[in-house]
From Swiss-Prot:
Pfam families: DUF520. Nucleotide-binding protein. PANTHER family: UPF0234 PROTEIN YAJQ. Coiled coil: none annotated. The keyword Nucleotide-binding applies. GO terms for molecular function: nucleotide binding. Keywords: Nucleotide-binding. This is Nucleotide-binding protein Mfla_1706. Belongs to the YajQ family. InterPro entries: DUF520, UPF0234-like_C, UPF0234_N, YajQ-like_sf. The keyword Nucleotide-binding applies. It comes from the Bacteria. The lineage of its organism: Bacteria, Pseudomonadati, Pseudomonadota, Betaproteobacteria, Nitrosomonadales. It comes from Methylobacillus flagellatus (strain ATCC 51484 / DSM 6875 / VKM B-1610 / KT).
Length: 164
């Protein structure tokens, strides 16, 4: 029986390029000269840390970062979980943006429920941070891909491991 997996993985190369571009733009901006404005990517933990002198500066850094992510096709802008702004020494602030990787249990259940309610003759099962969809024909699976793409637009999904 044909099957495929629905997953959500971060393209770390594109994300790193976007953060590097944003870092260069921050270093070159005249209103950030002489300030502690910076941006860091921790690939291992999946965190982007923004440093600045005020909340306004953090907003400006985000205004630089998000379009850079869109240009580099790092669909991670939808994946960012904005943590609270933290005050650090003196009047400096930092904010951590956590990158959500994989499909969490809530979204996986939503996908399975959508497929059951859709009336398409497929079976969906949750396997860790992926959802495996199995159907009788390849055409039905292609309908499922189109249906899921249309139904879930708030989180980037990839469809892979297509087996016949």
């Amino acid at each position: 029986m044909p099957s495929f997996d629905i997953s959500s993985e971060v393209d770390m190369v594109a994300l790193k390029n976007a953060v590097d571009v944003a870092g260069r733009q921050i270093a070159n901006r005249y209103d950030f000269k002489g300030t502690s404005a910076s941006i860091e990517l921790n690939e291992k933990d999946g965190l982007i840390t923004l440093h600045g002198d005020s909340d306004f500066q953090l907003d400006q850094i985000k205004a630089i970062l998000l379009p850079a992510m869109e240009k580099k096709e790092a669909d991670s802008a939808k994946r960012l979980d904005h943590q609270d702004v933290q005050k650090i020494s003196g009047n400096k602030v930092k904010q951590v943006l956590k990158i959500k990787a994989g499909i969490d249990a809530e979204l996986a259940k939503k996908i399975v429920r959508l497929l059951k309610d859709s009336g398409l003759k497929v079976q969906a099962s949750i396997q860790g941070d992926e959802v495996r969809v199995t159907g009788a024909k390849r055409d039905v699976l292609q309908e499922v891909i189109a249906f899921v793409r249309k139904s879930i637009t708030d989180f980037p999904l990839q469809f892979g491991n297509f087996r016949d």
